Amino acid sequence: MTERLIITSSSEIVLKSPTVRRFMENRLRRQVRDALRRKGIRHVYITKGGGRTYVCCSDPEAALQLILRIPGIDFASIAFRTEPDISLMCNAATECLAASLSVGQSFAVRAKVVDNKALSKKDIEIRVGQAILDRLADKALRVNLDSPDKTAYVEVRGADAFVYSDIRDGSGGLPVGTQGKMLGIFSDVALSAVASWMMLRRGALIIPVCLEAQRDQSSVPLATIANSLSRFREWVPVPRLVALILRTEGVLRRINEMTTENVSKLVYLGSILRALDAIATEEGALGVVVANRTMLDPAIISRCRTPIYQPLIGLDERELEKYISILGIGPGQVHEPHGLLAECAEKVPDLALLLDDRELQDEVMSMAKNRETLIL
Protein backbone atom coordinates (compact mmCIF):
# COMPACT_ATOMS: atom_id res chain seq x y z
CA MET A 1 0.00 0.00 0.00
CA THR A 2 1.30 3.45 -0.96
CA GLU A 3 -0.07 6.77 0.29
CA ARG A 4 0.92 10.42 -0.10
CA LEU A 5 1.60 12.51 2.96
CA ILE A 6 3.76 15.39 4.13
CA ILE A 7 7.04 14.74 5.90
CA THR A 8 8.49 17.54 8.04
CA SER A 9 11.58 18.12 10.14
CA SER A 10 12.22 20.44 13.08
CA SER A 11 15.98 20.58 13.47
CA GLU A 12 16.04 23.07 16.36
CA ILE A 13 13.49 21.16 18.44
CA VAL A 14 15.50 17.92 18.32
CA LEU A 15 18.33 19.67 20.17
CA LYS A 16 16.19 20.14 23.28
CA SER A 17 16.03 17.88 26.33
CA PRO A 18 13.49 15.01 26.14
CA THR A 19 10.92 16.84 28.30
CA VAL A 20 11.21 20.16 26.44
CA ARG A 21 11.29 18.39 23.10
CA ARG A 22 8.10 16.48 23.88
CA PHE A 23 6.38 19.71 24.95
CA MET A 24 7.39 21.52 21.76
CA GLU A 25 6.51 18.63 19.48
CA ASN A 26 3.04 18.37 21.00
CA ARG A 27 2.52 22.13 20.61
CA LEU A 28 3.71 22.00 17.00
CA ARG A 29 1.41 19.11 16.08
CA ARG A 30 -1.56 20.95 17.54
CA GLN A 31 -0.68 24.10 15.60
CA VAL A 32 -0.30 22.17 12.33
CA ARG A 33 -3.72 20.61 12.87
CA ASP A 34 -5.31 23.98 13.74
CA ALA A 35 -3.73 25.73 10.74
CA LEU A 36 -4.98 23.10 8.29
CA ARG A 37 -8.49 22.94 9.73
CA ARG A 38 -8.72 26.73 9.71
CA LYS A 39 -8.26 26.59 5.92
CA GLY A 40 -10.79 23.79 5.45
CA ILE A 41 -8.35 20.89 5.04
CA ARG A 42 -9.90 17.80 6.61
CA HIS A 43 -9.00 14.26 7.67
CA VAL A 44 -5.83 15.51 9.34
CA TYR A 45 -3.85 12.76 11.04
CA ILE A 46 -0.40 13.50 12.49
CA THR A 47 2.25 11.09 13.77
CA LYS A 48 5.90 11.50 14.69
CA GLY A 49 9.05 9.44 14.89
CA GLY A 50 12.79 9.69 14.37
CA GLY A 51 12.87 13.48 14.38
CA ARG A 52 10.18 13.63 11.72
CA THR A 53 6.52 14.60 11.78
CA TYR A 54 4.16 12.98 9.28
CA VAL A 55 0.95 14.73 8.22
CA CYS A 56 -1.82 12.85 6.41
CA CYS A 57 -4.72 14.93 5.10
CA SER A 58 -7.24 15.37 2.30
CA ASP A 59 -5.15 17.82 0.24
CA PRO A 60 -1.34 17.42 0.64
CA GLU A 61 -0.46 20.13 -1.92
CA ALA A 62 -2.51 22.84 -0.21
CA ALA A 63 -1.43 21.64 3.23
CA LEU A 64 2.25 21.87 2.29
CA GLN A 65 1.97 25.59 1.53
CA LEU A 66 0.40 26.20 4.94
CA ILE A 67 2.83 24.00 6.85
CA LEU A 68 5.86 25.79 5.40
CA ARG A 69 4.69 28.98 7.14
CA ILE A 70 4.42 27.46 10.60
CA PRO A 71 7.32 28.39 12.91
CA GLY A 72 9.12 25.29 14.14
CA ILE A 73 9.07 23.58 10.73
CA ASP A 74 12.58 23.50 9.27
CA PHE A 75 11.68 21.77 6.02
CA ALA A 76 8.78 19.86 4.52
CA SER A 77 8.08 17.75 1.46
CA ILE A 78 5.31 15.68 -0.04
CA ALA A 79 6.35 12.04 0.32
CA PHE A 80 5.18 8.55 -0.53
CA ARG A 81 4.82 6.13 2.36
CA THR A 82 5.15 2.45 1.42
CA GLU A 83 6.17 -0.83 2.93
CA PRO A 84 9.97 -1.33 3.04
CA ASP A 85 9.91 -3.32 -0.19
CA ILE A 86 12.47 -2.55 -2.90
CA SER A 87 9.96 -2.72 -5.76
CA LEU A 88 7.56 -0.33 -4.01
CA MET A 89 10.38 2.08 -3.18
CA CYS A 90 11.55 1.98 -6.81
CA ASN A 91 8.03 2.83 -7.99
CA ALA A 92 7.75 5.74 -5.56
CA ALA A 93 11.19 7.15 -6.37
CA THR A 94 10.52 6.97 -10.10
CA GLU A 95 7.22 8.78 -9.67
CA CYS A 96 8.91 11.45 -7.54
CA LEU A 97 11.51 12.26 -10.20
CA ALA A 98 9.62 11.56 -13.43
CA ALA A 99 7.99 14.98 -13.72
CA SER A 100 10.88 17.08 -12.41
CA LEU A 101 13.80 15.64 -14.41
CA SER A 102 14.44 16.87 -17.96
CA VAL A 103 16.33 15.10 -20.72
CA GLY A 104 20.03 14.73 -19.92
CA GLN A 105 19.81 15.86 -16.30
CA SER A 106 21.47 14.07 -13.40
CA PHE A 107 20.13 12.59 -10.19
CA ALA A 108 21.22 10.82 -7.02
CA VAL A 109 19.55 8.55 -4.49
CA ARG A 110 20.20 9.10 -0.77
CA ALA A 111 19.01 6.39 1.58
CA LYS A 112 18.73 6.12 5.35
CA VAL A 113 17.83 2.97 7.26
CA VAL A 114 16.68 2.93 10.89
CA ASP A 115 15.43 -0.11 12.85
CA ASN A 116 15.44 -2.43 9.84
CA LYS A 117 18.20 -5.03 9.48
CA ALA A 118 16.81 -6.60 6.31
CA LEU A 119 17.88 -3.69 4.10
CA SER A 120 21.12 -1.78 3.74
CA LYS A 121 21.57 1.84 2.75
CA LYS A 122 23.96 1.05 -0.11
CA ASP A 123 21.74 -1.68 -1.54
CA ILE A 124 18.73 0.66 -1.60
CA GLU A 125 20.68 3.42 -3.33
CA ILE A 126 22.03 1.08 -6.03
CA ARG A 127 18.79 -0.73 -6.80
CA VAL A 128 16.52 2.33 -6.68
CA GLY A 129 18.99 4.31 -8.79
CA GLN A 130 19.15 1.55 -11.40
CA ALA A 131 15.36 1.34 -11.51
CA ILE A 132 15.13 5.08 -12.20
CA LEU A 133 17.68 4.80 -15.03
CA ASP A 134 15.81 1.87 -16.57
CA ARG A 135 12.29 3.26 -16.28
CA LEU A 136 13.20 6.77 -17.44
CA ALA A 137 15.61 5.61 -20.14
CA ASP A 138 14.00 7.92 -22.70
CA LYS A 139 15.34 10.92 -20.76
CA ALA A 140 18.99 9.76 -20.96
CA LEU A 141 19.54 10.53 -17.29
CA ARG A 142 22.92 10.50 -15.57
CA VAL A 143 23.94 9.64 -12.02
CA ASN A 144 25.86 12.39 -10.24
CA LEU A 145 26.58 11.80 -6.57
CA ASP A 146 28.42 15.08 -6.02
CA SER A 147 26.15 17.71 -7.55
CA PRO A 148 22.93 16.17 -8.90
CA ASP A 149 20.14 18.19 -10.49
CA LYS A 150 17.60 16.23 -8.42
CA THR A 151 17.83 13.90 -5.43
CA ALA A 152 15.49 11.13 -4.37
CA TYR A 153 15.49 10.53 -0.61
CA VAL A 154 14.53 7.12 0.75
CA GLU A 155 14.08 6.73 4.51
CA VAL A 156 13.35 3.28 5.89
CA ARG A 157 12.10 3.44 9.46
CA GLY A 158 11.04 0.10 10.87
CA ALA A 159 8.03 -1.16 8.95
CA ASP A 160 7.64 1.99 6.83
CA ALA A 161 9.54 3.57 3.96
CA PHE A 162 9.26 7.23 2.98
CA VAL A 163 10.31 8.46 -0.46
CA TYR A 164 10.47 12.15 -1.41
CA SER A 165 12.50 14.55 -3.56
CA ASP A 166 11.29 18.15 -3.49
CA ILE A 167 12.46 19.55 -0.15
CA ARG A 168 11.04 22.98 0.70
CA ASP A 169 12.47 25.26 3.38
CA GLY A 170 10.10 26.18 6.20
CA SER A 171 10.09 29.03 8.70
CA GLY A 172 12.44 27.28 11.12
CA GLY A 173 12.69 28.43 14.71
CA LEU A 174 10.45 27.30 17.57
CA PRO A 175 6.71 26.62 17.84
CA VAL A 176 4.60 29.70 18.54
CA GLY A 177 3.79 30.26 22.20
CA THR A 178 6.50 28.02 23.63
CA GLN A 179 8.41 31.15 24.72
CA GLY A 180 5.46 33.12 26.07
CA LYS A 181 3.54 36.12 24.71
CA MET A 182 4.75 39.51 23.46
CA LEU A 183 3.09 42.69 22.29
CA GLY A 184 4.00 43.70 18.74
CA ILE A 185 3.51 47.32 17.66
CA PHE A 186 1.94 47.64 14.20
CA SER A 187 2.34 51.22 13.03
CA ASP A 188 3.64 51.16 9.45
CA VAL A 189 3.24 49.38 6.11
CA ALA A 190 5.83 46.62 6.41
CA LEU A 191 8.56 46.79 9.07
CA SER A 192 6.24 46.24 12.04
CA ALA A 193 5.07 42.95 10.53
CA VAL A 194 8.66 41.86 9.86
CA ALA A 195 9.74 42.63 13.44
CA SER A 196 6.82 40.70 14.93
CA TRP A 197 7.36 37.82 12.49
CA MET A 198 10.99 37.49 13.54
CA MET A 199 9.99 37.17 17.20
CA LEU A 200 7.15 34.82 16.22
CA ARG A 201 9.76 32.47 14.75
CA ARG A 202 11.58 32.49 18.08
CA GLY A 203 8.55 30.99 19.79
CA ALA A 204 6.71 34.12 20.98
CA LEU A 205 2.95 34.42 20.49
CA ILE A 206 2.56 37.98 19.22
CA ILE A 207 -0.40 40.09 20.34
CA PRO A 208 -0.59 42.77 17.62
CA VAL A 209 -1.16 46.32 18.83
CA CYS A 210 -2.35 48.68 16.09
CA LEU A 211 -1.88 52.41 16.57
CA GLU A 212 -4.66 54.56 15.17
CA ALA A 213 -2.53 57.67 14.90
CA GLN A 214 -2.84 60.73 12.70
CA ARG A 215 0.24 62.42 14.12
CA ASP A 216 1.34 63.98 10.84
CA GLN A 217 1.28 63.37 7.09
CA SER A 218 3.74 60.45 7.46
CA SER A 219 1.35 58.54 9.72
CA VAL A 220 -0.02 55.33 8.24
CA PRO A 221 -3.84 54.96 8.20
CA LEU A 222 -5.32 52.14 10.26
CA ALA A 223 -6.76 50.52 7.12
CA THR A 224 -3.26 50.22 5.64
CA ILE A 225 -1.92 48.75 8.87
CA ALA A 226 -4.80 46.27 8.85
CA ASN A 227 -3.67 45.00 5.44
CA SER A 228 -0.18 44.36 6.80
CA LEU A 229 -1.71 42.69 9.85
CA SER A 230 -3.80 40.37 7.69
CA ARG A 231 -0.64 39.17 5.94
CA PHE A 232 1.04 38.59 9.28
CA ARG A 233 -1.99 36.62 10.48
CA GLU A 234 -1.33 33.95 7.84
CA TRP A 235 1.87 33.00 9.67
CA VAL A 236 0.30 32.64 13.13
CA PRO A 237 -0.90 29.02 13.56
CA VAL A 238 -3.54 29.60 16.22
CA PRO A 239 -7.33 29.32 15.77
CA ARG A 240 -8.03 32.75 17.20
CA LEU A 241 -5.72 35.77 17.29
CA VAL A 242 -6.78 38.89 19.17
CA ALA A 243 -5.31 42.22 18.08
CA LEU A 244 -5.53 45.42 20.11
CA ILE A 245 -6.28 48.89 18.78
CA LEU A 246 -5.09 52.01 20.60
CA ARG A 247 -6.89 55.28 19.86
CA THR A 248 -4.24 57.95 20.33
CA GLU A 249 -6.20 61.19 19.82
CA GLY A 250 -6.05 62.28 23.46
CA VAL A 251 -2.35 61.49 23.81
CA LEU A 252 -1.48 63.33 20.60
CA ARG A 253 -3.52 66.35 21.62
CA ARG A 254 -1.66 66.68 24.92
CA ILE A 255 1.73 66.13 23.27
CA ASN A 256 1.05 68.86 20.71
CA GLU A 257 0.16 71.25 23.53
CA MET A 258 3.46 70.51 25.29
CA THR A 259 6.14 70.19 22.61
CA THR A 260 7.48 71.14 19.23
CA GLU A 261 7.17 68.83 16.22
CA ASN A 262 10.62 67.22 16.53
CA VAL A 263 10.31 66.61 20.26
CA SER A 264 6.77 65.25 19.92
CA LYS A 265 8.03 62.23 17.97
CA LEU A 266 10.07 61.09 20.94
CA VAL A 267 7.42 61.87 23.53
CA TYR A 268 4.90 59.99 21.40
CA LEU A 269 6.97 56.78 21.36
CA GLY A 270 7.69 57.04 25.07
CA SER A 271 3.97 57.44 25.75
CA ILE A 272 3.08 54.43 23.60
CA LEU A 273 5.64 52.29 25.43
CA ARG A 274 4.25 53.39 28.78
CA ALA A 275 0.77 52.32 27.68
CA LEU A 276 2.09 48.99 26.41
CA ASP A 277 3.83 48.39 29.72
CA ALA A 278 0.47 48.57 31.48
CA ILE A 279 -1.17 46.35 28.84
CA ALA A 280 1.66 43.80 29.03
CA THR A 281 1.06 43.38 32.75
CA GLU A 282 -2.64 42.69 32.18
CA GLU A 283 -2.08 40.38 29.19
CA GLY A 284 0.82 38.46 30.74
CA ALA A 285 3.16 39.53 27.92
CA LEU A 286 6.89 39.11 28.48
CA GLY A 287 8.08 41.77 26.05
CA VAL A 288 7.28 44.54 23.58
CA VAL A 289 8.45 44.29 19.96
CA VAL A 290 9.22 47.52 18.09
CA ALA A 291 10.37 47.95 14.50
CA ASN A 292 12.78 50.84 15.09
CA ARG A 293 16.20 50.14 13.60
CA THR A 294 18.12 52.58 15.81
CA MET A 295 18.71 52.26 19.53
CA LEU A 296 16.01 53.93 21.60
CA ASP A 297 16.93 56.65 24.07
CA PRO A 298 17.24 55.47 27.71
CA ALA A 299 14.71 58.10 28.77
CA ILE A 300 12.17 56.44 26.48
CA ILE A 301 13.06 52.86 27.40
CA SER A 302 12.84 53.63 31.12
CA ARG A 303 9.10 54.34 30.73
CA CYS A 304 8.51 50.66 29.96
CA ARG A 305 9.49 48.14 32.62
CA THR A 306 8.60 45.34 30.23
CA PRO A 307 11.64 44.31 28.12
CA ILE A 308 11.75 45.94 24.68
CA TYR A 309 12.91 43.92 21.67
CA GLN A 310 14.27 45.49 18.47
CA PRO A 311 14.87 42.53 16.13
CA LEU A 312 15.50 44.70 13.06
CA ILE A 313 18.68 46.28 14.43
CA GLY A 314 21.58 45.04 12.33
CA LEU A 315 19.52 44.17 9.25
CA ASP A 316 20.29 45.99 6.01
CA GLU A 317 17.80 47.05 3.35
CA ARG A 318 18.36 43.94 1.24
CA GLU A 319 17.53 41.63 4.14
CA LEU A 320 14.47 43.67 5.06
CA GLU A 321 13.16 43.65 1.50
CA LYS A 322 13.67 39.87 1.40
CA TYR A 323 11.59 39.38 4.56
CA ILE A 324 8.91 41.78 3.33
CA SER A 325 8.65 39.69 0.17
CA ILE A 326 8.47 36.44 2.16
CA LEU A 327 5.56 37.80 4.18
CA GLY A 328 3.78 38.70 0.96
CA ILE A 329 3.21 42.29 1.99
CA GLY A 330 4.44 43.62 -1.34
CA PRO A 331 6.71 46.62 -1.92
CA GLY A 332 7.27 48.37 1.37
CA GLN A 333 9.13 51.46 2.44
CA VAL A 334 12.15 50.60 4.56
CA HIS A 335 12.16 53.49 7.01
CA GLU A 336 11.79 54.11 10.70
CA PRO A 337 8.17 53.93 11.93
CA HIS A 338 6.95 57.46 12.78
CA GLY A 339 10.33 58.88 11.65
CA LEU A 340 11.68 58.31 15.16
CA LEU A 341 15.45 58.70 15.23
CA ALA A 342 17.47 58.03 18.38
CA GLU A 343 19.95 60.82 17.80
CA CYS A 344 17.17 63.41 18.19
CA ALA A 345 16.96 62.57 21.86
CA GLU A 346 20.39 64.07 22.53
CA LYS A 347 18.93 67.50 21.76
CA VAL A 348 16.10 67.10 24.27
CA PRO A 349 17.58 67.32 27.78
CA ASP A 350 14.11 67.64 29.37
CA LEU A 351 12.66 64.57 27.61
CA ALA A 352 12.19 62.73 30.90
CA LEU A 353 10.26 65.67 32.36
CA LEU A 354 8.00 65.82 29.33
CA LEU A 355 7.25 62.10 29.55
CA ASP A 356 6.36 62.46 33.23
CA ASP A 357 3.78 65.18 32.64
CA ARG A 358 0.77 64.28 34.79
CA GLU A 359 -1.90 65.12 32.21
CA LEU A 360 -0.03 63.15 29.56
CA GLN A 361 0.22 60.14 31.87
CA ASP A 362 -3.52 60.29 32.50
CA GLU A 363 -4.19 60.28 28.75
CA VAL A 364 -1.79 57.36 28.29
CA MET A 365 -3.47 55.26 30.98
CA SER A 366 -6.90 56.12 29.57
CA MET A 367 -5.76 55.00 26.12
CA ALA A 368 -4.50 51.69 27.51
CA LYS A 369 -7.66 51.09 29.53
CA ASN A 370 -10.00 51.85 26.63
CA ARG A 371 -8.16 49.74 24.06
CA GLU A 372 -10.32 47.97 21.50
CA THR A 373 -10.02 44.38 20.33
CA LEU A 374 -10.09 42.90 16.85
CA ILE A 375 -10.55 39.15 16.33
CA LEU A 376 -8.44 37.80 13.47
Describe each region flagged by the PLM.
Residues 1-22:
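Short glycine-/aliphatic-rich beta-strand segments at the starts of folded cytosolic domains
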Residues 21, 25, 29, 60-64, ...:
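Generic alpha-helical secondary structure
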Residues 4-7, 23-26, 31, 35, ...:
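Nucleotide-activated chemistry modules centered on ATP-dependent adenylation/adenylyltransferase
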Residues 83-176:
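Non-catalytic substrate-recognition/targeting regions of SAM-dependent transferases
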Residues 16, 120, 217-221:
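Secondary-structure boundary/capping motif
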Residues 34-112:
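Non-catalytic nucleic-acid substrate-recognition regions in nucleic-acid-modifying enzymes
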Residues 12-15, 114-116, 251, 260:
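A short, flexible beta-alpha/helix-coil linker loop
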